[in-house]
Amino acid sequence: MTLKLTDIVLTYPDGDRTLTALDHVDLAVAPGEFTAVVGPSGSGKSSLLAVAATLITPTSGTVSVAGREVSAMTQAARTRVRRDHVGIVFQQANLLPSLTALDQLLVVAHLAGGSPRAAAARARELLLSVDLCGKEHKRPHQMSGGERQRVNIARALMNEPEVLLVDEPTSALDHERGERVVSLLAELTRRNDLATVMVTHDLGSLSAVDMVLTMRDGRLTAGDIRGVHSAG
């Protein structure tokens, strides 16, 4: 498995209490597999994504990314794993307002080092793959919400990750644009052999995913998504 979380527990102190954000969670995602995690606000979805991204260390359990067990690594080592093997699509695109679509991607490549010529070729290829051909010189204010989100996705793929983690990609989009973004994620997952995890509350955008998991009260279960909204 490209991404594997085993018996993950994540707790936080809250005064004289201990809050459990993740309660013995297991998750395994293979290359080319697109998994969606749905659940109400406060159910633990964001915590799950943060643990998978190596942004926070679980209280107990193990995290394996691209065959590397990262739970016991130093912060510097986890950062290298995240940079080299994980792409993250944040809920808000957070594009730099003064940069064109092409330059948004080139900034990522510059931070990682490598050949500027190869980076430019990679960036143009990615913009083509997310249906932004001819729009590489547009700035964020000149793009629609769907176009900005596609730049966000392309940016996450710039360093050729094996794991793609996606946080609420349709939250700022109407239904039609949201469906297009999720279909694009499914296509990119298969084309690039990615292990993709998307957390979402949008039950209307799940037709393109391979597996749907439900999170409630920090527990992850397969299948039944009834009551996801009402539970929140």
Regions found by a protein language model. Name each.
Residues 2-3, 8-191, 196-216:
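ABC family nucleotide-binding domain
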Residues 219-232:
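Conserved beta-strand-loop-alpha-helix hinge in the C-terminal portion
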